[in-house]
């Protein structure tokens, strides 16, 4: 199985501490571009697959990457792209769709000069209908939620990002599938996100995606929550973590048998991280 990881925009980033969980999965945060690329290649050589990736511009003005890889018993063919312009993104969508792939995740961030996109693709072996959007305004995304939900689609991936000093934009991936009810929020301050988070938990909804993002000097949060049965093992979500704090949180949840499924970075008086951890069974870490 041949996998590609392509970067069109090179940047030099400050390497931050990387945390690893060995065995069935591995997780890294705060990687520079070359280290990120090397990690993907090294694990690909061992037949591991990328399950999540994200990027953000750190306080030094360089791009830092976060990465989660797993060693599943079997998986569909997959491809990754990163540091794509909007035009590159649109060309890749047409190319990969024509080859029978579907977009699993898109992550957008305000780059050093322009907005950049990361993309994770899987072979669409089950012919699942899907759709994607980038550079949507808040109003456009809100309209999309209503339209796609009405037509039986679920939000699979959501990424918020800044455009200039005053405009928030959103990238999303949708798939036509049944599933638990969802709640989606965008444009929240940290305090507003905490309020929504607490209320969602009371109502039986738990985070499956969290996307903190910068626009200008502001920090905002977007997220997807899904309803879970009372007996289900719930995910754990934390944000506002420094790199060192994230390492401690990571180690704490790893000892309890959890793994990160989302790791996202942003700037807020320095580099901060947000993550979602899910319980795994028979995981070797």
Regions found by a protein language model. Give the residues of each.
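Fungal secretory targeting signals
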Residues: 1-20
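Terminus-proximal functional modules
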Residues: 18-285
């Amino acid at each position: 199985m041949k996998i590609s990881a392509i970067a069109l925009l090179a940047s030099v980033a400050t390497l931050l501490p990387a945390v690893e969980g060995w065995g069935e999965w591995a997780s890294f945060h705060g990687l520079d571009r070359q280290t990120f690329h090397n990690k993907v290649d090294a694990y690909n050589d061992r037949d591991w697959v990328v399950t999540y990736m994200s990027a953000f511009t750190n306080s030094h003005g360089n791009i830092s990457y976060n990465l989660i890889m797993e060693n599943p018993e079997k998986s569909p063919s997959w491809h990754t792209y990163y540091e794509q312009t909007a035009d590159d993104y649109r060309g890749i969508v047409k190319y990969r769709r024509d080859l029978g792939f579907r977009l699993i995740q898109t992550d957008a961030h305000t780059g050093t000069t322009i907005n950049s996109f990361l993309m994770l693709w899987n072979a669409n072996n089950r012919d699942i209908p899907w759709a994607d959007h980038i550079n949507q305004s808040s109003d456009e995304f809100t309209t999309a939620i209503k339209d796609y939900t009405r037509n039986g689609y679920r939000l699979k991936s959501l990424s918020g990002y800044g455009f200039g000093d005053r405009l928030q934009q959103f990238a999303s991936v949708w798939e036509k599938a049944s599933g638990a009810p969802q709640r989606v929020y965008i444009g929240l301050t940290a305090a507003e996100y905490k309020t929504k988070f607490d209320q969602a938990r009371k109502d039986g909804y738990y985070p499956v995606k969290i996307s903190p993002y910068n626009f200008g000097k502001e920090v905002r949060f977007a997220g997807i929550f899904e309803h879970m049965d009372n007996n289900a093992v719930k995910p754990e979500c934390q944000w506002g973590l420094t790199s060192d704090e994230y390492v401690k949180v990571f180690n704490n949840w790893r000892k309890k048998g959890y793994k990160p499924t989302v790791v996202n970075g942003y700037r807020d008086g320095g580099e901060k991280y947000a993550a979602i951890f899910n319980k795994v069974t028979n995981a070797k870490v």
